[in-house]
């Protein structure tokens, strides 16, 4: 079997992958999604000797019939089954040691995770200096919002429409 340092690293990797993506997980049990992620990230599933389908089949074999998760002991059984398939020319013990070395000390990778986009349309929408029309009146020169003063239309109840320029000159034109 694998050396004690490999076993400790293997258990640590099991716990890290078991809690990945689930803030409520205890790290004692791993679901099928995280098992598949572990096999893919640690290069156990290489796409040739071991495929994603093989990984799912082994998971289904080792878990209990009604269970949806595996514990650490079932995890080791699953690795033994995959080890002989992944490393065909080696004995069972050598293959298990090799697969333990692939997994020991690894963490879930965040490759392919979507990053915040900062170009094109997003830049125009978040830069207040580029606002036009009535929206630019809602912000001062520094880009800070003016609050209610920037949003509130002051009611002009003088009787004139807003575009009329000669407000207040009618009485001067008409003599009484």
Swiss-Prot record:
BP-aspect Gene Ontology terms: decidualization; embryo implantation; microtubule bundle formation; microtubule polymerization
Biased composition (Basic and acidic residues): 134-144
UniProt region (Disordered), positions on chain: 132-152
Annotated disulfide bonds: none
Keywords, in A-Z order: Acetylation, Cytoplasm, Cytoskeleton, Microtubule
Induction field: Up-regulated by estradiol.
Location of N-acetylalanine modifications: 2
One Gene Ontology term, aspect cellular component: microtubule
Coiled-coil residue spans: none
Compartments it resides in: Cytoplasm; Cytoplasm, Cytoskeleton
InterPro entries associated with the record: EF-hand-dom_pair, TPP/p25
Record carries keyword Membrane: no
Example of a GO MF term: tubulin binding
Pfam families for the chain: p25-alpha
Stretches that traverse the bilayer: none
Main location: cytoplasm
Record-linked SUPFAM superfamilies: EF-hand
Similarity section: Belongs to the TPPP family.
Its job: Regulator of microtubule dynamic that has microtubule bundling activity. Required for embryo implantation; possibly by regulating beta-catenin. Also required for decidualization via regulation of beta-catenin.
Protein name: Tubulin polymerization-promoting protein family member 3
Organism: Mus musculus
Lineage: Eukaryota, Metazoa, Chordata, Craniata, Vertebrata
Gene expressing this chain: Tppp3
């Amino acid at each position: 079997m694998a050396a004690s340092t490999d076993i400790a690293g293997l258990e640590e990797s099991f716990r890290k992958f078991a809690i990945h993506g689930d803030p409520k997980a205890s790290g004692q049990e791993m679901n099928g999604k995280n098992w598949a992620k572990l096999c893919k990230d640690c290069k156990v599933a290489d796409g040739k000797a071991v495929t994603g389908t093989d990984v799912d089949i082994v998971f289904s074999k080792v878990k209990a019939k009604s269970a949806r998760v595996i514990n650490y002991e079932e995890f080791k059984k699953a690795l033994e089954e995959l080890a002989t398939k992944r490393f065909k020319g080696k004995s069972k013990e050598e293959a298990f040691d090799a697969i333990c070395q692939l997994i020991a000390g690894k963490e879930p990778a965040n490759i392919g995770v979507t990053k915040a986009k900062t170009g094109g349309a997003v830049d125009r929408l978040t830069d207040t200096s580029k606002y036009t029309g009535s929206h630019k009146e809602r912000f001062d020169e520094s880009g800070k919002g003016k609050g209610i003063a920037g949003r509130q239309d002051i009611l002009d109840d003088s009787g004139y429409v807003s575009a009329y320029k000669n407000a207040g000159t009618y009485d001067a034109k008409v003599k009484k």
